[in-house]
Amino acid sequence: MIIMKPRNKRNKKFKKPEWLIEVEDKIEKMADEEFDKLFEEIYEKLNRGGLREVLNVHKTDKSKYKKYKKPKWLIEAEKELEKAIETGEYFKWLKEQGEKYRKQKKEIKKNNF
């Protein structure tokens, strides 16, 4: 698209030619019409089937899937970690956890043999 520039550089006010204004108006009208069509389609789908149809999401039976629950030991460990971070004894807590883990490992080895 060619945009005409003013010949006189002192003339700061530049008026667009009429043909350019007409072309821009036509483009805006076409864009508005397409947007209106899309909006109407989405609105109809929302009225018919709800948001799932618009997003093309298939309905699933939630009864098939069990909700994941954290085990108790994990919840307790997270609480201990939060307390250790708040009190500033994080490294001490890490050391204690390492010692507990090593003891458990030794007990498992003794029980297996």
UniProtKB/Swiss-Prot annotation:
Name by which UniProt lists this protein: Uncharacterized protein MJ1151
Top-rank lineage group of the source organism: Archaea
